[in-house]
């Protein structure tokens, strides 16, 4: 029993390695880009002619800053996909697609529930009674701020469903939806159902 639990925890830990591997590169891009586009830094070191607005180097550093920031802004989605890939036994690419779909479905369903309960108003603004920082924009969808934890939960759930259903055989009339296609469709339905239960 202990060996089985330890084995599963090892697989979960290894599944974190893929998303974590991108963080140092993204951190360097973000750090260098933001440091050398900071107006105070540029003025303090007298680098206005070299790094000031309108220079080619400034444009390159702004791009580096934005590229590094894109990774950190979307860490939950990256972890959802990485964990789903790492935990899937076979057909890992299908698991990755399922994770992306489930992540968007989860956030859209949460947005709908927040709108229904009046925490997000009809004009898209957040109600005054909601604690600041509780609701944030996730890939353009106003949802609860769950961070990387939400992505990990989605990835683990998708991998569990994928490993169970990616080989399923359906009757001939529905055979198009069998196998990996069923895993993707079923994951979508389960993500919606799970969020509706909340």
Model-derived segments and spans:
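Transmembrane alpha-helical segments of polytopic membrane transport and secretion proteins
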Residues: 1-3
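N-terminal low-complexity segments that are often proline-rich with Ser/Thr-Pro
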Residues: 174, 195-198
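Small-residue-rich segments of transmembrane alpha-helices in multi-pass membrane proteins
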Residues: 181-186
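Early transmembrane hairpin of solute transport permeases
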Residues: 6-177
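Conserved small/polar residues in nucleotide/adenosyl-binding loops
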Residues: 187-194
């Amino acid at each position: 029993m202990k060996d089985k639990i330890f084995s599963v925890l090892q697989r979960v830990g290894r599944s974190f390695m893929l998303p974590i591997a991108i963080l140092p590169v993204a951190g360097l891009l973000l750090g260098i880009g933001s440091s050398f586009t900071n107006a105070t830094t540029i003025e303090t070191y007298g680098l206005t002619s070299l790094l000031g607005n309108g220079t080619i180097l400034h444009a390159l550093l702004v791009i580096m800053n934005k590229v590094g920031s894109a990774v950190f802004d979307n860490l939950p989605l990256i972890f959802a996909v990485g964990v789903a890939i790492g935990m899937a036994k076979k057909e890992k690419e299908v698991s990755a697609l399922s994770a992306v779909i489930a992540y968007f479905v989860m956030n859209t369903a949460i947005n709908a529930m927040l709108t229904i309960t009046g925490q997000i108003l009809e004009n898209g603004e957040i109600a005054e009674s909601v604690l600041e920082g509780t609701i944030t924009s996730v890939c353009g969808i106003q949802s609860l701020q769950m961070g990387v934890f939400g992505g990990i939960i989605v990835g683990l759930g998708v991998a569990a469903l994928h490993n169970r259903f990616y080989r399923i055989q359906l009757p001939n009339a529905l055979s198009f939806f069998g196998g990996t296609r069923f895993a993707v469709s079923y994951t979508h339905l389960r993500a919606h159902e799970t969020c509706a239960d909340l």
